[in-house]
Amino acid sequence: MARLMGVDLPREKRMEIALTYIYGIGRTRSKEILEATGVSPDLRSKDLSDDDLTKLRDYIEASEFKVEGDLRREVQADIRRKIEIGCYQGLRHRRGLPVRGQRTKTNARTRKGPKKTVAGKKK
């Protein structure tokens, strides 16, 4: 099994898709990486040679973009900073509500968690 940046790449997927399993790499960046390293996007990750794997690893580490742990730490630090300075987005993060202006009268169940039933008015 091919292991890259601390992530096990799925064996049966094409490299173009398999690279997207690394946090911080999407389809566009995956194509860019494969083009720069000369690895075929149609190659399955199980058929990847050690030389190809080394080329991919070196290119990702040498590139300016952050992936995996570094990117996760940066995102968490940004959220922590917003909470500390007390901006609106920080307050929304602290309360566990949607941050980007979505409605909350209905929906937002993923962010708010399961419904808390409130007793109805008795007649």
From Swiss-Prot:
Which keywords accompany this UniProt record? Ribonucleoprotein, Ribosomal protein, RNA-binding, rRNA-binding, tRNA-binding
Location of the region described as Disordered in the Swiss-Prot/TrEMBL record: 96-123
User: Which PROSITE patterns has this protein been placed in?
Assistant: RIBOSOMAL_S13_1 (PS00646), RIBOSOMAL_S13_2 (PS50159)
InterPro entries registered for this protein in UniProt? Rbsml_uS13_C, Ribosomal_uS13, Ribosomal_uS13-like_H2TH, Ribosomal_uS13_bac-type, Ribosomal_uS13_CS
Give start-end ranges for the coiled-coil region(s).
none
Gene Ontology molecular functions: rRNA binding; structural constituent of ribosome; tRNA binding
One GO BP annotation of this record: translation
- GO cellular-component terms in the record? cytosol; small ribosomal subunit
Indicate the family of this protein.
Belongs to the universal ribosomal protein uS13 family.
Q: What is this protein's function per UniProt?
A: Located at the top of the head of the 30S subunit, it contacts several helices of the 16S rRNA. In the 70S ribosome it contacts the 23S rRNA (bridge B1a) and protein L5 of the 50S subunit (bridge B1b), connecting the 2 subunits; these bridges are implicated in subunit movement. Contacts the tRNAs in the A and P-sites.
**How is the quaternary structure described?**
Part of the 30S ribosomal subunit. Forms a loose heterodimer with protein S19. Forms two bridges to the 50S subunit in the 70S ribosome.
The entry's protein name is Small ribosomal subunit protein uS13
